[in-house]
Amino acid sequence: MSMPFRVLGIETSCDETAAAVVEPAADGRGGRIMAEALLSQVEEHRPYGGVVPEIAARSHLDHVDSLVIRALGEAGLTVHDIDAVAATGGPGLIGGVIVGVMTAKAIAQVAGKPFIAVNHLEGHALTVRMTAGIDFPYLLLLASGGHCQLLAVEGVGRAKRLGTTIDDAAGEAFDKVAKMLGLGYPGGPAVERAARRGDPRRFRLPRPLLDRPGCDLSFSGLKTAVRQTVEKLPPGPLSEGDIADLCASFQAAVADCLADRCRVAAGIFSARHGRGRPLVVAGGVAANASLRAALTEVARQADMTFVAPPLALCTDNAAMIAWVGVERLRLGLVDTMDFKPRPRWPLDPDAPKAAGAGGVKA
């Protein structure tokens, strides 16, 4: 198989339908996005305040073919010019995952190309290998709407979980607080915008598990504290100032929690792998500027290098799926047509279940 490997990636795990073509850089470090096409379903789900799985699956089915055609066209390629087809195989909303996997399998069969099922979480985890060309191992905080984990990423398909949320993910807490305050969907960007105008010291909110041993996280109690704070305010609609101060106080609490857990994880990671390795932040929550600033300081104090994907690649996208396809294709790791989509697919299948983590999606 000739270099460079050009891989078509398809992402349909939640509320973005996307296709992209990626190839490795000429020097073998990092990669290049040849083309990408993405359709967000935000407006379709906004009236419901969150993602409706049936609507998401139908939208993926309606649009995935045209996005694949667009991505290939922008790359100047046909399906016969690519070296493999990769698709998110899980975890995610199973209806959408099925759409992407079946589309990728059909293209692979027609073109006679390998099919690669990608763990959506590994897509986030390896994005910085495409954008920054960093080497293994590195410490990863993966924080999104459905997942919040600290992992030692040691290779393709090799990650050791150091900590995880025992209840809500950080992004889920952002979404629920936004809904509580009437800020709409998606909640993360709305809370961040409101927080810029607010006073993070006005409301004293808890920092769950702060200074406790281990690297596990918790956000359910913080979310509840915001609701209780709202209930103590004078009756009637919240003022813009109240909303801004609540958002700023909540965001500061999340930043403190993530920073504290990352400090603990950095100590564990550095003891195993040596100092000076990267601290990587990925997932939708990594787009939050306040959280990036807090974690940049953690990296500095721990003698680590802070690395995060470009903002456009923090949220779900197909380029990260195609890139994992490149990484796996290099190693000869391809899948058969018998692969079954997985609603759950942990990055570290050997990690014990966190105490109280009954609702954790990964």
Curated annotation (Swiss-Prot):
<dbReference type="GO" id="GO:0005737">
    <property type="term" value="C:cytoplasm"/>
</dbReference>
<feature type="binding site">
    <location>
        <position position="188"/>
    </location>
    <ligand>
        <name>substrate</name>
    </ligand>
</feature>
<feature type="compositionally biased region" description="Basic and acidic residues">
    <location>
        <begin position="342"/>
        <end position="351"/>
    </location>
</feature>
<dbReference type="GO" id="GO:0061711">
    <property type="term" value="F:N(6)-L-threonylcarbamoyladenine synthase activity"/>
</dbReference>
<keyword id="KW-0479">Metal-binding</keyword>
<dbReference type="InterPro" id="IPR022450">
    <property type="entry name" value="TsaD"/>
</dbReference>
<feature type="binding site">
    <location>
        <position position="316"/>
    </location>
    <ligand>
        <name>Fe cation</name>
    </ligand>
</feature>
<keyword id="KW-0808">Transferase</keyword>
<comment type="function">
    <text>Required for the formation of a threonylcarbamoyl group on adenosine at position 37 (t(6)A37) in tRNAs that read codons beginning with adenine. Is involved in the transfer of the threonylcarbamoyl moiety of threonylcarbamoyl-AMP (TC-AMP) to the N6 group of A37, together with TsaE and TsaB. TsaD likely plays a direct catalytic role in this reaction.</text>
</comment>
<feature type="binding site">
    <location>
        <position position="175"/>
    </location>
    <ligand>
        <name>substrate</name>
    </ligand>
</feature>
<dbReference type="InterPro" id="IPR000905">
    <property type="entry name" value="Gcp-like_dom"/>
</dbReference>
<feature type="binding site">
    <location>
        <position position="124"/>
    </location>
    <ligand>
        <name>Fe cation</name>
    </ligand>
</feature>
<feature type="region of interest" description="Disordered">
    <location>
        <begin position="342"/>
        <end position="362"/>
    </location>
</feature>
<feature type="binding site">
    <location>
        <begin position="142"/>
        <end position="146"/>
    </location>
    <ligand>
        <name>substrate</name>
    </ligand>
</feature>
<comment type="similarity">
    <text>Belongs to the KAE1 / TsaD family.</text>
</comment>
<dbReference type="InterPro" id="IPR017861">
    <property type="entry name" value="KAE1/TsaD"/>
</dbReference>
<keyword id="KW-0408">Iron</keyword>
<keyword id="KW-0819">tRNA processing</keyword>
<dbReference type="GO" id="GO:0002949">
    <property type="term" value="P:tRNA threonylcarbamoyladenosine modification"/>
</dbReference>
<feature type="binding site">
    <location>
        <position position="120"/>
    </location>
    <ligand>
        <name>Fe cation</name>
    </ligand>
</feature>
<keyword id="KW-0012">Acyltransferase</keyword>
<dbReference type="GO" id="GO:0005506">
    <property type="term" value="F:iron ion binding"/>
</dbReference>
<protein>
    <recommendedName>
        <fullName>tRNA N6-adenosine threonylcarbamoyltransferase</fullName>
        <ecNumber>2.3.1.234</ecNumber>
    </recommendedName>
</protein>
<dbReference type="InterPro" id="IPR043129">
    <property type="entry name" value="ATPase_NBD"/>
</dbReference>
<dbReference type="Pfam" id="PF00814">
    <property type="entry name" value="TsaD"/>
</dbReference>
<keyword id="KW-0963">Cytoplasm</keyword>
<feature type="binding site">
    <location>
        <position position="288"/>
    </location>
    <ligand>
        <name>substrate</name>
    </ligand>
</feature>
